[in-house]
Amino acid sequence: MDYSKTLRLPQTEFPMRGNLPQKEPQFVELWQDKDLYNKRIEKRKKEGAPRFVLHDGPPYANGKIHIGHALNKTLKDIIVRYKYMAGYMANYIPGWDTHGLPIEYAVLKDSGEDRANMSVLELRRKCLEYAKKWIEIQKTDFIRMGVIGDFDNRYVTFDPHLEAKEIEVFGEMARKGYIYKGKKAVYWCSHCETALAEAEIEYKDRKSPSIYVKFPAKNIKGLGPEGVDQSKLFAVIWTTTPWTIPANQYISVNPKFTYVWVHNLDADEYYLMNKELAPAALADCKIENYEFAGREMTGAEWELAEFMHPWASYNRTVYVLEGNHVTLDAGTGCVHTAPGHGVDDFEVYKKYENEGKLKQEVICPVDNKGRMTAEAGSFLEGKTVWEAEGPSISALAHEGMLLGKKSLHHQYAHCWRCKNPVIYRATEQWFASINDFREDALKAVDATRFIPSWGHDRLYNMIRDRQDWCISRQRSWGVPIPAFYCDGCGSYVITPETIASVKEIVEKEGTDAWWAHPAEELLPKDFKCPHCGGSRFHQEKDIMDVWFDSGSTWNGVLKDPHPVWKDTGAAYPCDLYLEGSDQHRGWFHSSLLTSVAVNGCAPYKAVLTHGFTMDGEGRKMSKSVGNVVAPQDIIDKYGADVMRLWISSVDYQGDVRLSDKIVKSMSDVYRKIRNTFRYLLGNLYDFDPKTDSVAYGDMEELDRWALLRLEQVKRTVLKAYEDYEFHVMYHAVHNFCTVDLSSIYLDILKDRLYTEKDDSLLRRSAQTAMYEILTSLVRLVAPVICFTAEEVWQALPNREEREWSVHMADMPAENDRYLDKALEEKWKKRLALRSVVTKALEEARRAKVIGHPLDAEITIYADGEHLETLKAMEKELADFCLVSQAKISGDLSAAPENAFASEDGTVKVSIAVCTLEKCERCWKRTPDVNSDPKHEHVCARCAKVLTEMGE
């Protein structure tokens, strides 16, 4: 007889191979057709569920998504999906950052047109088309990754509602006195011809000239060495930007530092330097024959002493200023100070101006294109700042003022878009004054939860130490600075009335209205200049920093949302901002400043940051290096779920590594998890939980142990989700599937499932546990492997009695009954013994003592507690160890020499070939094979089952 037909072997249509690249889009279509996102919101609204809002940090609408986007969006999606399943009305409105230099730069580059030959409105129209194109491309990619959200009603910073709400933020900050226009040294990109903020700066290695320059003494308040002619006295500065020498107006010293005269014995010259820095500086200048002369002096003694500019033709007095920015890191302690080309330089001068000690025009002999102006001198005029370096050094040498020169490799600021080096340049710009609300901003940082916790100090220190925020840009594609200029008196005008008028028009027409209408049509009717009563005005041409755009989205999406988001989006402050760690100086930063300035609080309750994606060796990904792993390539080859599983597996709070090898390894892990689901499904084909379930108290002890482990894993996973520690969830699920289930529980269970009568208590007990495990596990992993979880859910029995999608379901509830401590302790001991037996069997198979484990007969030697554990399970010991026969001995010394021993030697296992006849149905070797004449070649257990089956 062919007994295989009498076995209850697994049956399922759930395939072994995921075929994810082809199958996942079908689930995307299912979710879209059934409006999954809105159905979830409607369900939670009916339940009166608490709200959870993750505000999306908008990616820039420029180019295809990269693996960093995939990491970011998937982390957000895991959280949103989990929060819904945990009982929240979890909304997610995806957004896009659409204004600014990168898009304008790309449009001009693609079109090949000169900005000067294009009207502002024409350029803006092309920028809008460009942004819309990339939004659709990125949106398609995000949806394909499994991201769920209100994509039909996404937010974009070019939306008139958001533009109007941004103008409202600006207006409120202006009303409070936080907005001003002034001349300051700001980052300037001469290629893009605009000011830049710190967040728009990238630092790259650059080789620069490093020079030491002499400034002749003029009026040094009697501080020179006694008896030395003043013509021999010089202050020495150090700089890596020789092109700024024409703009030098001051020398800064630290008032607390000690300064000395250094006598260069060979040249018979005296140099003013900091005492600690002098030896290194002199070594750079190759001066070996020197001595200190005169007394030691503090920097404070030198305040407002006078030197001369090193170029005699300038005939410029250079004053000494006190500056706490002067450090002992490098140089001479006498710092070259050009207010037109340095933030610290400008601030130290302004302090003196504000105190009435000095009043001079700030010199900035560089134009918008980064070329030297006539103010620098005819020998430099027209040259770029970089071209001016060589002639500047030559001129210093010609004048005899170049003391030393070498090259220096250092990190230098570059433009984030065009990648060219930037300069500091003093220009008229619009600023947000941070000092006025800095303390409130720091309190808001303290009130925020940071994950990881070090994010607090990073953002706190940035806010504490930052300068005023330059919010104006000299470009066209963006939200205008809503300021007017009176043609009569020249004053700028920003009032609550003008802001309200502009905001109303922008809400209807968008910010194109700023360039499409004359000022009179944008201002309130019959508006008069508050300064002179004039009635003719023109608009500001500058636009706002894109970080002001994205930093104001809380106002238009969270606090006062568009009607389409009213029911789901409004939540201010929101629960969470989640972005890369670079956003401490970017979106987290700008959002905090605008929100605190207007409302006195942060726009978020918590901030979560992730690291950057590196290659498998920890290097930055680069097209030129060829180590880029694109999300589209992973999805096309392996499927989005494999990528999502990888993202859940890494500790994203630091930098994470990715390579083809890592993805391949993750696909193997995915396959193991998938096969666990497949096996569970395959053994539930004839199980109806309503009629076939076994009460917990009547279940087999092994099945109750499996539920115990399920409960422990469930609690670990749910806590991991709550703590945003997805790698903890990943490892718990992976271990549960591969060890607890595949290697232990399901392995032991096979005999029961396949050979027992279909409706026997033994089989139904196993199926009851498996059904509970399957329906719980599929929900636990649904936020991560969202496509596979849906596929499993659709394959479950009794589909009509559940939610139509796993993503409409709740997370499994905790069940205290499963946490049986006594059972846990008992099975820890049993499994420890089984582990020893398993290793012994593996060794015996390698030595070819046995083939299949059911060909084995084992004897376990133990004493004490181990012996008690073995005796308590003597009847089921063979089944537990997956062998045909198992014996117990309480005499360790009786074990043969070749017996396998545990590491501590307290358990030994001998293995022999079992010579009993093999049951042709269950393959066990037992003494009762052929005991039933009706059923030859089968054991008594199988014969009984066959009789019950009517065979």
Language-model regions, residue ranges each:
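Residue patterns forming the tRNA-binding/recognition surfaces of aminoacyl-tRNA synthetases
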Residues: 2-20, 26, 30-34, 108-246, ...
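N-terminal catalytic cores of NTP/NDP-binding nucleotidyl/phosphoryl-transfer enzymes
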Residues: 43-106, 157, 237-244, 319-348, ...
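Secondary-structure capping and boundary motifs in well-ordered enzyme cores
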Residues: 46, 50-57, 67-71, 75, ...
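Acidic, turn-prone loop/beta-hairpin segments
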Residues: 97, 190, 197-202, 537, ...
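Residues immediately within or flanking Cys/His clusters that coordinate Zn2+
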Residues: 186, 412, 483, 526, ...
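Short cysteine-rich clusters marking metal-coordination/redox-active sites
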Residues: 189, 415, 486, 529-532, ...
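Cys/His-coordinated zinc-binding microdomains
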Residues: 193, 474, 490, 533, ...
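Protease-associated
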Residues: 250, 257-334, 343-347
